[in-house]
Each structure stands twice: as structure tokens, then as C-alpha cells.
């Protein structure tokens, strides 16, 4: 099975990478960019027998810092 894990910063957590991208877009002449939030995407190919609990554990233990990040899992 193929999964996509999308990791984003929680609301209220400062995003310096997003702010740098927003500033760079403005410097390149792109107007109207009001906010940018950066995140990560992981695409995993796992055995069909892999449980949802195992995927959740992968996310919590390695792929996302659950103190400051949220994650969601999409089946591809």
C-alpha cells in the first residue's frame, strides 16, 4: 500500500521557513502573498498487512514532532 503523510506546524507555532519563503516571493515581484506555512510530505510504500496503528506509531516516533506539528495520512 502507498501512503502520503502530510506534516504541518500546529496553529500558533512560528514558521520562520514560511516567513522566509513569503519574503522571497515578495522580492521576486509576486504580490498578494499574505502568508506561507511550510510543511513536509512523506510518501511511503508499505506491506498491505501494515496496521494503521503501526503507521501512527511511525508518525509519532519519527516523521512528526507532535509537540509542534500535526500530521495526516492519505492512502494513495
Feature roles, as predicted:
Residues 2-43, 47-50, 54-76:
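Long, contiguous binding/interaction regions
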Amino acid at each position: 500500500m502507498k501512503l502520503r503523510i502530510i506534516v504541518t506546524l500546529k496553529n500558533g507555532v512560528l514558521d520562520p521557513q514560511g516567513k522566509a519563503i513569503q519574503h522571497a516571493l515578495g522580492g521576486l515581484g509576486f504580490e498578494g502573498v499574505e502568508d506561507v506555512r511550510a510543511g513536509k510530505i512523506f510518501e511511503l510504500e508499505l506491506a498491505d498487512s501494515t496496521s494503521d496503528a503501526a503507521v501512527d506509531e511511525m508518525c509519532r516516533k519519527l516523521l512528526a514532532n507532535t509537540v509542534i506539528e500535526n500530521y495526516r495520512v492519505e492512502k494513495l
